């Protein structure tokens, strides 16, 4: 599998992130509220993972519409519901894998996205939107570095000051 870029729901420096995404061909995963970054910029991730508790009403509506369109809706996947959808912006048509997690879980949505990436063969994972204002979230995200390393993958927490 090619490299993976996960966009989480924290602070994202828009211009830096958009430029980075253009320059790096990678599998794109939105972790919960990270979906809103993609939708705001008319980009499509390859996968969306989360319990979607922090999505805006527009983000939730997008997922509801996709779920209604899906032929594979409500396929159980170990505590998750998973479906694939096709969505296009302009001329782009793309299949998006959506994994809905149960709200009662031990892992953060970002950690679940990272674990999914590793399970599917990713060895290098870059994560945006994890170096924001909340120190408790930042500390938890530092833990992802060790968790990934223990599973044979390398994680980089990316923002315009750290890459």
How would you label these PLM feature ranges?
Residues 146-163:
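Class I SAM-dependent methyltransferase SAM-binding "motif I" and its flanking Rossmann-like core
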Residues 101-137:
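Ordered, amphipathic secondary-structure segments that act as subunit-interaction surfaces
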Residues 1-65:
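N-terminal beta-strand-loop-alpha-helix module at the start
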Residues 7, 29-32, 50, 99-100, ...:
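General beta-strand structural signal in soluble alpha/beta enzymes
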Residues 59-67, 94-115:
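Glycine/small-residue-rich loop that forms an oxyanion/phosphate-binding "nest" at active or ligand-binding sites
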Residues 70-73:
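Intrinsic disorder
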Residues 136-146:
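Short Gly/Thr/Asp-enriched flexible loops that form oxyanion-binding sites at enzyme active sites
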């Amino acid at each position: 599998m090619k490299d993976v870029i996960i966009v989480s729901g924290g602070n994202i420096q828009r211009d830096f992130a958009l430029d980075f995404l253009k320059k790096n061909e990678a599998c794109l995963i939105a972790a919960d509220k990270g979906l809103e970054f993609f939708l705001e910029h008319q980009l499509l991730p390859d996968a969306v993972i989360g319990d979607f508790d922090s999505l805006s009403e527009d983000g939730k509506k997008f997922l509801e519409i996709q779920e209604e369109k899906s032929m594979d809706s409500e396929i159980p996947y170990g505590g998750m519901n998973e479906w694939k959808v096709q969505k296009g912006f302009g001329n782009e048509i793309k299949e998006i894998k959506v994994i809905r997690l149960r709200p009662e879980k031990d892992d953060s949505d970002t950690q679940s996205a990272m674990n999914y990436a590793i399970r599917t063969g990713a060895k290098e994972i870059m994560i945006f939107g994890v170096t924001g204002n909340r120190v408790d979230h930042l500390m938890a995200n530092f833990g992802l570095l060790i968790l990934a390393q223990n599973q044979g993958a390398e994680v980089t927490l990316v923002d315009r000051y750290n890459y």
